């Protein structure tokens, strides 16, 4: 009897805490041209000086992720925003598989990439580089 209770509790616990991690890739960024033409609004002077010293141009990767997109993701039921990447224009989230998949209907979501690769369905087979 003890073994059955232990087995059931372990099964229930794994179902209860089945949180998934995923990167939500976004379609675009707001005010890209304005941000690039006035880089001090998105980068510190020290960062601008470092890029200039290395001969690295300021581009779309330096523009932050659109804050209204992050706010909308945070407002979704069962979703916790853990991190954001301006280089990839993506947000790292945690939630149930169902809650994360529900984000795909948002107009600004390009695709979803689960940490558990077996959950990745519907992702385009060929991705265009965001840096071209």
Where are the regions that the model predicts?
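Short, intrinsically disordered, charge-balanced linker/junction segments flanking boundaries
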Residues: 128-132
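Bacterial Sec-dependent N-terminal signal peptides
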Residues: 1-24
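Inhibitory N-terminal propeptides of secreted protease zymogens
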Residues: 19-127
């Amino acid at each position: 009897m003890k073994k059955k209770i232990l087995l059931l509790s372990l099964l229930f616990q794994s179902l209860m805490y089945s949180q998934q991690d995923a990167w939500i890739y976004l379609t675009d960024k707001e005010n890209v041209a304005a941000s690039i033409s006035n880089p001090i609004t998105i980068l510190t002077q020290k960062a601008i000086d470092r890029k200039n010293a290395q001969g690295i141009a300021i581009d779309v990767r330096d523009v932050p992720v659109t804050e209204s997109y992050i706010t909308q993701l945070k407002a979704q039921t069962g979703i916790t925003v853990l991190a954001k990447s301006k280089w990839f224009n993506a947000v790292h989230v945690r939630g149930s598989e169902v809650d994360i998949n529900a984000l795909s209907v948002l107009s600004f979501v390009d695709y979803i990439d689960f940490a558990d690769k077996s959950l990745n369905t519907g992702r385009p087979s060929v991705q265009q580089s965001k840096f071209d």
